[in-house]
Amino acid sequence: MVEEEVAKKYDSSFTAGKNTVQQIQAQVDTATQEESSQGPVLLNQHPETTSVPYTPETVGQQLMVSLPGEPHGTSAMPSMCPSLILQPCATTDPMLLQPQVMGPSASNQASVSATLEWQEMLEAAEALLALKNSSQTRHQPCGMPGTAGERGLQLANPSMPPRPTSSGSLPSGHLDCMSLLT
């Protein structure tokens, strides 16, 4: 019973919407012709109806209408009938059909990704320094000692094993001993 009432109401709304669209299309056509010769004209007549393709969305929503020959820019239709939404008859570009919005979650995701990448690079640099230090203890020392107050990478010394450095205190180093940092 309720479904029948909704169907009747939808059919009557659909028919009324179709008639309104046909009247508006005829008024727009007439206004376009008259405006080009005489300037702006107020429309209050109801010329004969014409066929207009239409696509209703669902019951309770606005009627979606595509007008043939309507430019993709602004139109006089929204000011005359604000309950209509105009759209082009066909869209062939698939990129226009997909949302192009980049929300805050995408921005946060990019920031987290960059931070993780930086952390991985830092860990790789520390691992390379540790590897270089371990290989230097097996070979002869570099021969160019750092200054007495310098913290960080300790050059190989036969009496003292190399001390690993933290990521915050990496020295710029001597070119003949360390070529990792740029």
UniProtKB/Swiss-Prot annotation:
<protein>
    <recommendedName>
        <fullName>Doublesex- and mab-3-related transcription factor C1</fullName>
    </recommendedName>
</protein>
<keyword id="KW-0804">Transcription</keyword>
<keyword id="KW-0805">Transcription regulation</keyword>
<dbReference type="InterPro" id="IPR031577">
    <property type="entry name" value="DMRT-C1/C2_C"/>
</dbReference>
<comment type="similarity">
    <text>Belongs to the DMRT family.</text>
</comment>
<feature type="compositionally biased region" description="Polar residues">
    <location>
        <begin position="26"/>
        <end position="39"/>
    </location>
</feature>
<feature type="region of interest" description="Disordered">
    <location>
        <begin position="26"/>
        <end position="48"/>
    </location>
</feature>
<keyword id="KW-0597">Phosphoprotein</keyword>
<feature type="region of interest" description="Disordered">
    <location>
        <begin position="136"/>
        <end position="174"/>
    </location>
</feature>
<dbReference type="Pfam" id="PF15791">
    <property type="entry name" value="DMRT-like"/>
</dbReference>
